[in-house]
Amino acid sequence: MNKYLTWVEVNLAAIRHNVRVLRKLAPPSAGLAGKTKILTVIKADAYGHGMIPVAKVLVKEKVDFLGLSNLTEGITLRKAGIKTPILLFETTLAEQAKDIIDYRLTPTVCTHELAAALNHYAQKRKCVVDIHVKVDTGMGRLGVWHEEALGFIKKLSRLRNLRIQGICTHFPSADTDRAFTQKQIQQLSTLVGQLKRSDSNILYVHAANSMGLVGYKAQILNLARPGLMLYGLYPRPGLEKKVNLRPAMSVHSKIIFLKRIEKGRSISYGRTFVARRPMTVATLPIGYSDGYLR
Protein backbone atom coordinates (compact mmCIF):
# COMPACT_ATOMS: atom_id res chain seq x y z
CA MET A 1 0.00 0.00 0.00
CA ASN A 2 1.27 3.47 -0.91
CA LYS A 3 1.86 5.38 2.34
CA TYR A 4 1.56 8.71 0.52
CA LEU A 5 -1.79 10.26 -0.30
CA THR A 6 -0.30 12.43 -3.03
CA TRP A 7 2.63 11.32 -5.17
CA VAL A 8 4.41 11.75 -8.49
CA GLU A 9 5.25 8.94 -10.89
CA VAL A 10 8.06 9.28 -13.44
CA ASN A 11 7.97 7.17 -16.59
CA LEU A 12 11.58 6.61 -17.61
CA ALA A 13 10.44 4.80 -20.75
CA ALA A 14 8.84 8.08 -21.87
CA ILE A 15 12.17 9.88 -21.46
CA ARG A 16 13.84 7.14 -23.49
CA HIS A 17 11.22 7.61 -26.22
CA ASN A 18 11.55 11.39 -26.17
CA VAL A 19 15.33 11.45 -26.54
CA ARG A 20 15.02 9.19 -29.57
CA VAL A 21 12.49 11.59 -31.08
CA LEU A 22 14.84 14.51 -30.40
CA ARG A 23 17.67 12.74 -32.18
CA LYS A 24 15.51 12.43 -35.29
CA LEU A 25 14.63 16.14 -35.10
CA ALA A 26 18.29 17.17 -34.98
CA PRO A 27 19.40 18.70 -38.30
CA PRO A 28 22.59 17.74 -40.18
CA SER A 29 25.64 18.98 -38.31
CA ALA A 30 28.02 21.73 -39.29
CA GLY A 31 31.45 20.19 -39.52
CA LEU A 32 30.67 17.07 -37.48
CA ALA A 33 30.07 13.55 -38.74
CA GLY A 34 26.39 12.65 -38.80
CA LYS A 35 23.68 14.77 -37.20
CA THR A 36 23.80 17.56 -34.68
CA LYS A 37 24.97 16.21 -31.32
CA ILE A 38 22.58 16.13 -28.36
CA LEU A 39 23.18 17.61 -24.91
CA THR A 40 20.28 16.63 -22.68
CA VAL A 41 19.44 19.14 -19.94
CA ILE A 42 19.00 17.47 -16.55
CA LYS A 43 19.70 20.42 -14.25
CA ALA A 44 17.48 21.12 -11.21
CA ASP A 45 17.09 17.41 -10.45
CA ALA A 46 16.11 16.79 -14.09
CA TYR A 47 13.28 19.32 -13.76
CA GLY A 48 12.02 17.37 -10.76
CA HIS A 49 12.12 13.98 -12.50
CA GLY A 50 15.14 12.67 -10.59
CA MET A 51 18.59 13.55 -11.91
CA ILE A 52 20.37 10.25 -11.27
CA PRO A 53 17.76 7.80 -12.68
CA VAL A 54 17.18 10.08 -15.68
CA ALA A 55 20.94 10.34 -16.27
CA LYS A 56 21.28 6.55 -16.25
CA VAL A 57 18.62 6.25 -18.95
CA LEU A 58 20.33 8.90 -21.07
CA VAL A 59 23.72 7.24 -20.69
CA LYS A 60 22.23 4.02 -22.08
CA GLU A 61 20.85 6.08 -24.97
CA LYS A 62 24.40 7.31 -25.61
CA VAL A 63 23.68 11.04 -25.47
CA ASP A 64 26.75 13.15 -26.19
CA PHE A 65 26.57 15.46 -23.14
CA LEU A 66 24.58 15.94 -19.96
CA GLY A 67 23.79 19.54 -19.05
CA LEU A 68 23.75 20.68 -15.41
CA SER A 69 23.56 23.99 -13.61
CA ASN A 70 26.43 23.86 -11.19
CA LEU A 71 29.37 22.10 -9.61
CA THR A 72 27.31 20.44 -6.87
CA GLU A 73 25.09 18.72 -9.43
CA GLY A 74 28.15 17.62 -11.39
CA ILE A 75 29.83 16.07 -8.36
CA THR A 76 26.59 14.27 -7.48
CA LEU A 77 26.45 12.60 -10.89
CA ARG A 78 30.12 11.65 -10.88
CA LYS A 79 29.74 10.06 -7.43
CA ALA A 80 26.75 8.14 -8.84
CA GLY A 81 29.06 6.60 -11.42
CA ILE A 82 28.06 8.68 -14.45
CA LYS A 83 31.01 9.03 -16.85
CA THR A 84 29.34 10.82 -19.79
CA PRO A 85 30.73 14.33 -20.49
CA ILE A 86 29.00 16.92 -18.29
CA LEU A 87 28.71 20.60 -19.19
CA LEU A 88 28.06 23.06 -16.36
CA PHE A 89 25.86 25.91 -17.60
CA GLU A 90 26.61 28.32 -14.77
CA THR A 91 30.04 29.86 -14.75
CA THR A 92 31.85 28.94 -11.55
CA LEU A 93 34.20 30.78 -9.22
CA ALA A 94 37.96 30.48 -9.54
CA GLU A 95 38.08 28.77 -6.13
CA GLN A 96 36.06 25.87 -7.60
CA ALA A 97 38.54 25.18 -10.41
CA LYS A 98 40.27 22.31 -8.59
CA ASP A 99 37.01 20.39 -8.09
CA ILE A 100 36.00 20.93 -11.71
CA ILE A 101 39.21 19.25 -12.83
CA ASP A 102 39.16 16.53 -10.18
CA TYR A 103 35.61 15.49 -11.14
CA ARG A 104 36.26 15.77 -14.90
CA LEU A 105 33.57 18.36 -15.55
CA THR A 106 33.39 20.76 -18.48
CA PRO A 107 32.90 24.34 -17.24
CA THR A 108 31.32 27.32 -18.95
CA VAL A 109 33.84 30.15 -18.82
CA CYS A 110 33.25 33.89 -19.16
CA THR A 111 35.91 35.37 -16.85
CA HIS A 112 39.69 35.53 -17.11
CA GLU A 113 39.95 34.64 -13.41
CA LEU A 114 38.25 31.26 -13.85
CA ALA A 115 40.25 30.50 -17.00
CA ALA A 116 43.54 31.26 -15.22
CA ALA A 117 42.61 29.11 -12.22
CA LEU A 118 41.61 26.18 -14.43
CA ASN A 119 44.83 26.48 -16.38
CA HIS A 120 46.85 26.58 -13.14
CA TYR A 121 45.33 23.40 -11.70
CA ALA A 122 45.45 21.64 -15.07
CA GLN A 123 49.19 22.33 -15.22
CA LYS A 124 49.57 20.73 -11.79
CA ARG A 125 47.56 17.69 -12.92
CA LYS A 126 49.47 17.59 -16.23
CA CYS A 127 46.22 17.53 -18.17
CA VAL A 128 44.24 19.64 -20.63
CA VAL A 129 40.76 20.81 -19.62
CA ASP A 130 37.93 21.28 -22.10
CA ILE A 131 35.94 24.48 -21.62
CA HIS A 132 33.00 26.19 -23.33
CA VAL A 133 32.89 29.98 -23.63
CA LYS A 134 29.55 31.70 -23.00
CA VAL A 135 28.79 34.53 -25.42
CA ASP A 136 26.02 37.00 -24.58
CA THR A 137 23.98 37.84 -27.68
CA GLY A 138 20.96 39.20 -25.86
CA MET A 139 20.13 37.24 -22.71
CA GLY A 140 21.92 39.89 -20.63
CA ARG A 141 23.04 37.58 -17.84
CA LEU A 142 26.08 35.30 -17.98
CA GLY A 143 28.54 35.59 -20.81
CA VAL A 144 31.00 37.82 -22.61
CA TRP A 145 29.30 40.39 -24.85
CA HIS A 146 29.47 39.17 -28.43
CA GLU A 147 31.36 42.30 -29.48
CA GLU A 148 34.14 41.39 -27.02
CA ALA A 149 34.10 37.62 -27.48
CA LEU A 150 36.75 37.33 -30.20
CA GLY A 151 39.41 39.08 -28.11
CA PHE A 152 38.40 37.10 -25.01
CA ILE A 153 38.67 33.77 -26.83
CA LYS A 154 42.03 34.69 -28.35
CA LYS A 155 43.42 35.44 -24.89
CA LEU A 156 42.11 32.15 -23.51
CA SER A 157 43.60 30.23 -26.44
CA ARG A 158 47.07 31.20 -25.19
CA LEU A 159 46.55 29.15 -22.02
CA ARG A 160 48.24 25.86 -22.88
CA ASN A 161 46.29 23.64 -20.50
CA LEU A 162 42.87 24.75 -21.70
CA ARG A 163 41.10 23.62 -24.85
CA ILE A 164 38.18 25.75 -26.02
CA GLN A 165 35.91 22.89 -27.03
CA GLY A 166 32.81 24.98 -27.64
CA ILE A 167 31.16 28.38 -27.68
CA CYS A 168 27.55 28.95 -26.77
CA THR A 169 24.82 31.51 -26.33
CA HIS A 170 21.25 31.40 -25.03
CA PHE A 171 17.91 32.36 -26.58
CA PRO A 172 15.70 34.40 -24.18
CA SER A 173 12.67 34.53 -26.49
CA ALA A 174 12.92 31.82 -29.16
CA ASP A 175 9.22 31.05 -28.76
CA THR A 176 7.98 34.67 -28.96
CA ASP A 177 10.43 36.82 -30.94
CA ARG A 178 11.73 35.20 -34.09
CA ALA A 179 13.43 38.34 -35.42
CA PHE A 180 15.47 38.81 -32.23
CA THR A 181 16.45 35.14 -32.18
CA GLN A 182 17.57 35.28 -35.81
CA LYS A 183 19.66 38.33 -34.92
CA GLN A 184 21.31 36.34 -32.12
CA ILE A 185 22.11 33.51 -34.53
CA GLN A 186 23.63 36.01 -36.96
CA GLN A 187 25.80 37.53 -34.23
CA LEU A 188 27.04 34.09 -33.25
CA SER A 189 27.61 33.22 -36.91
CA THR A 190 29.73 36.34 -37.35
CA LEU A 191 31.87 35.31 -34.38
CA VAL A 192 32.28 31.78 -35.75
CA GLY A 193 33.45 33.22 -39.07
CA GLN A 194 35.99 35.41 -37.30
CA LEU A 195 37.29 32.44 -35.32
CA LYS A 196 37.65 30.30 -38.44
CA ARG A 197 39.67 33.02 -40.13
CA SER A 198 41.98 33.10 -37.11
CA ASP A 199 42.52 29.31 -37.34
CA SER A 200 40.59 28.59 -34.16
CA ASN A 201 39.71 24.91 -33.78
CA ILE A 202 36.43 25.03 -31.84
CA LEU A 203 34.43 21.82 -32.08
CA TYR A 204 30.96 22.78 -30.83
CA VAL A 205 28.73 25.79 -31.41
CA HIS A 206 25.46 25.67 -29.51
CA ALA A 207 22.45 27.79 -28.65
CA ALA A 208 19.34 25.75 -29.40
CA ASN A 209 17.07 24.89 -26.49
CA SER A 210 13.89 22.89 -27.20
CA MET A 211 12.30 25.73 -29.16
CA GLY A 212 15.56 26.43 -30.92
CA LEU A 213 15.80 22.80 -32.01
CA VAL A 214 12.36 22.66 -33.62
CA GLY A 215 12.01 26.27 -34.73
CA TYR A 216 15.39 27.31 -36.11
CA LYS A 217 17.75 25.58 -38.51
CA ALA A 218 21.10 27.35 -38.33
CA GLN A 219 24.05 25.82 -40.14
CA ILE A 220 26.57 26.98 -37.56
CA LEU A 221 24.89 25.11 -34.68
CA ASN A 222 26.02 21.51 -34.18
CA LEU A 223 25.04 20.77 -30.58
CA ALA A 224 21.43 21.05 -29.35
CA ARG A 225 20.38 21.49 -25.70
CA PRO A 226 16.77 20.25 -25.34
CA GLY A 227 15.22 20.50 -21.89
CA LEU A 228 11.42 20.71 -21.85
CA MET A 229 10.91 18.32 -24.74
CA LEU A 230 13.00 15.64 -23.07
CA TYR A 231 10.28 15.40 -20.43
CA GLY A 232 7.39 15.42 -22.89
CA LEU A 233 6.54 19.12 -22.72
CA TYR A 234 6.03 21.29 -25.80
CA PRO A 235 7.61 24.76 -26.04
CA ARG A 236 4.73 26.12 -28.12
CA PRO A 237 1.04 25.27 -28.71
CA GLY A 238 0.31 23.14 -31.75
CA LEU A 239 3.67 21.41 -31.81
CA GLU A 240 2.09 18.25 -30.43
CA LYS A 241 0.50 17.73 -33.88
CA LYS A 242 3.96 17.44 -35.45
CA VAL A 243 6.12 15.88 -32.75
CA ASN A 244 5.10 12.78 -30.82
CA LEU A 245 6.38 13.20 -27.28
CA ARG A 246 5.27 11.32 -24.18
CA PRO A 247 4.83 13.09 -20.82
CA ALA A 248 7.28 11.63 -18.33
CA MET A 249 5.60 12.82 -15.13
CA SER A 250 2.14 12.22 -13.73
CA VAL A 251 0.68 13.44 -10.43
CA HIS A 252 -1.66 11.26 -8.38
CA SER A 253 -3.76 11.88 -5.29
CA LYS A 254 -6.46 10.23 -3.22
CA ILE A 255 -9.74 11.80 -2.18
CA ILE A 256 -9.72 12.47 1.56
CA PHE A 257 -13.11 14.16 1.98
CA LEU A 258 -16.45 14.41 0.17
CA LYS A 259 -19.09 17.04 0.85
CA ARG A 260 -22.41 18.09 -0.65
CA ILE A 261 -22.82 21.81 -1.32
CA GLU A 262 -25.85 23.76 -2.42
CA LYS A 263 -26.19 26.31 -5.21
CA GLY A 264 -24.56 29.64 -4.30
CA ARG A 265 -21.92 28.24 -1.94
CA SER A 266 -18.33 29.37 -2.60
CA ILE A 267 -15.19 27.27 -2.33
CA SER A 268 -11.64 28.02 -1.19
CA TYR A 269 -9.42 31.12 -1.34
CA GLY A 270 -10.70 34.18 -3.11
CA ARG A 271 -14.13 32.56 -3.50
CA THR A 272 -13.28 32.13 -7.18
CA PHE A 273 -15.67 29.22 -7.57
CA VAL A 274 -19.36 29.55 -6.75
CA ALA A 275 -21.62 26.54 -7.26
CA ARG A 276 -24.30 27.11 -9.90
CA ARG A 277 -26.17 24.00 -8.80
CA PRO A 278 -26.10 21.44 -5.97
CA MET A 279 -23.02 19.23 -6.27
CA THR A 280 -20.55 16.97 -4.50
CA VAL A 281 -17.08 18.41 -3.86
CA ALA A 282 -14.00 16.22 -3.35
CA THR A 283 -10.94 17.43 -1.41
CA LEU A 284 -7.47 16.24 -2.40
CA PRO A 285 -4.42 16.57 -0.10
CA ILE A 286 -2.40 18.70 -2.50
CA GLY A 287 -2.09 22.47 -2.55
CA TYR A 288 -0.07 25.63 -2.32
CA SER A 289 2.74 24.13 -0.23
CA ASP A 290 3.20 21.40 -2.87
CA GLY A 291 3.61 23.91 -5.67
CA TYR A 292 0.03 23.62 -6.89
CA LEU A 293 -1.12 27.20 -7.36
CA ARG A 294 -4.35 28.07 -5.65
Kindly give the residue locations of the regions a language model identified.
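A structural micro-motif recognizing beta-strand termini
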Residues: 284-291
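Short Gly/Ser/Thr- and charged-rich N-terminal loops/segments
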Residues: 28-35
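Anionic-ligand-binding alpha/beta catalytic cores of soluble enzymes and soluble regulatory domains
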Residues: 178-277
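Active-site-proximal beta-alpha core segment in soluble small-molecule metabolic enzymes
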Residues: 2, 6-9, 14-17, 35-206, ...
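A short, Lys/Arg-enriched amphipathic alpha-helix followed by its capping loop at the start of a domain
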Residues: 21-28, 60-61
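Catalytic metal-binding/acid-base residues of hydrolase active sites
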Residues: 138, 172, 211, 229, ...
